């Protein structure tokens, strides 16, 4: 039974779970659909290996052949989870990564870390650097495998950031979504089959929408589970930490994924339609920008708004931010962003785009047909080589005016258009879609 949020704002609370911490995010947008103690720190156990694999993919070469060192074989507990590598064994980085993500091979993480990071200490530095780049503020990693260390911790939110970054790497998703991997023979062992330990991909608790994930368990960490799932075009990532048992962590994850799939709806801006994505600006009527098949200023069609089913979108708050630091290029130039929030929750965003499809007319033609009280002609043509303007030696002034053009484009071209059209228009379009959906 779904309950309303304790704040009374109508946002659904979601199911009760036994894990002490959890979060579900939309994998494509990063929007948070459910959370429980998502900033509380826990030990991640083997869910650490998501970061290990991501760092190896970004910094290593899958075809490299590594040799398992004495340290990799012996400095990791022989009774912990392993893929079966021994000292002197030679495997490719790719084979080791399958062993890490499927069999949770601790010795494989050490071997990969030594190879990719030049030393295990160097690799751990790469792990912490990557976590920081992703915005993980409550995490620190002391090893590559996740076996207990007091200085090795994270939280559900940070782990979701790591999992989402990994989701954006196609090779990672290929590995984590593999149920069985045929490991070829090596110089030490015969060929064998590696089996994914995630029960949603294999075993009696198979979940039909699961596309990957990682398990984790130690005495101190309890039971942790990260799951990737896809249903009806929605891609979700669930993170559950510090659950009492394996059965509990899988039951929690299934509940959360089913809840979010069934009670949230998403709308992509490109579902609205091309004409409704554009809005007027003074550039549409400028003779300096002739024959524009696309609008000069528009919103990106790739943005997505995600809300609970039946939610009143008109209650959302709209925030517009502009970016004047860009360098104009042909094609789409991101010049701002619209963010939709509900309370403290971000429910969607989309980019404001300046479309630079072609060079303007010549300065001479522009002067003849464009009123002088509009944008100054020298500002419009500030990106043109000064020598072509007949004013050699004024390159610095031209560059200054080029920057001014960008600021004018923002202030004149989209200042009113964005506020009037997008802020009200997109809300109205989504509201109309919701009404149609409810009538069905």
Residue ranges and their predicted role:
Residues 46, 260, 429-430:
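Short alpha-helical segments used as structural interaction elements across diverse proteins
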Residues 43, 372, 389, 426-427:
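A general, composition-driven signal for non-globular sequence regions
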Residues 136-137, 150-153, 157-158, 163-413:
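Domain-terminus/edge residues, biased toward the C-terminal soluble/receptor-binding domains
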Residues 412-420:
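Single-pass type I membrane protein transmembrane segment
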Residues 422-440:
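C-terminal membrane-anchoring or membrane-association module
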Residues 1-157, 161-175:
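Active-site-adjacent loops and short helices of periplasmic peptidoglycan-processing enzymes
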């Amino acid at each position: 039974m779904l309950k309303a949020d304790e704040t009374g704002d109508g946002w659904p609370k979601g199911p009760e779970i036994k894990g002490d911490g959890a979060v579900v995010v939309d994998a494509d947008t990063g929007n948070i659909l459910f959370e429980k103690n998502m900033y509380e720190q826990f030990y991640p156990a083997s869910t650490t290996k998501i970061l290990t694999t991501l760092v190896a993919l970004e910094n290593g070469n899958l075809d490299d052949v590594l040799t398992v060192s004495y340290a990799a074989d012996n400095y990791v507990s022989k009774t912990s989870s392993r893929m079966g590598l021994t000292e002197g064994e030679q495997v490719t980085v790719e084979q080791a990564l399958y062993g890490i993500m499927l069999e949770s091979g601790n010795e494989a993480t050490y071997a990969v870390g030594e190879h990719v990071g030049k030393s295990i200490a160097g690799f751990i530095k790469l792990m912490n650097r990557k976590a920081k780049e992703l915005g993980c503020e409550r995490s620190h990693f002391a090893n590559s495998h996740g076996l207990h260390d007091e200085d090795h911790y994270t939280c559900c939110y940070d782990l979701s950031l790591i999992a989402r970054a990994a989701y954006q790497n196609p090779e990672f998703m290929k590995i984590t979504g593999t149920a069985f991997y045929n490991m070829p023979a090596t110089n030490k062992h015969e060929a064998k089959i590696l089996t994914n330990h995630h029960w949603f991909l294999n075993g009696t608790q198979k979940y039909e929408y699961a596309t990957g994930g990682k398990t984790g368990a130690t005495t101190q960490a309890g039971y942790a589970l990260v799951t990737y799932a896809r249903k009806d075009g929605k891609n979700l990532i669930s993170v559950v930490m510090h659950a009492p048992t394996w059965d509990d962590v899988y039951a929690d994850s299934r509940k959360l994924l089913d809840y979010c799939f069934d009670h949230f709806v998403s709308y992509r801006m490109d579902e609205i339609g091309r004409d409704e994505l554009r809005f007027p600006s003074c550039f549409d009527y400028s003779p300096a920008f002739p024959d524009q098949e696309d609008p000069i200023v528009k919103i990106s069609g790739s943005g997505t708004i995600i809300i609970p089913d039946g939610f009143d979108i008109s209650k959302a708050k709209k925030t517009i931010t502009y970016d004047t630091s860009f360098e104009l290029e042909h094609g789409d130039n991101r010049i701002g962003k619209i963010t939709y929030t509900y309370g403290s929750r971000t429910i969607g965003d989309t980019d404001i785009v300046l479309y630079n499809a072609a060079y303007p007319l010549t300065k001479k033609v522009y002067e003849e047909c464009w009123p002088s009280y509009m944008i100054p002609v020298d500002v419009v043509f500030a990106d043109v080589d000064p020598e072509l303007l007949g004013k050699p030696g004024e390159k610095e002034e031209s560059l200054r005016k080029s920057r001014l053009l960008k600021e004018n484009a923002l202030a004149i071209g989209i200042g009113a258009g964005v506020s009037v059209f997008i802020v009200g228009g997109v809300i109205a379009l989504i509201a109309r879609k919701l009404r149609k959906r409810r009538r069905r």
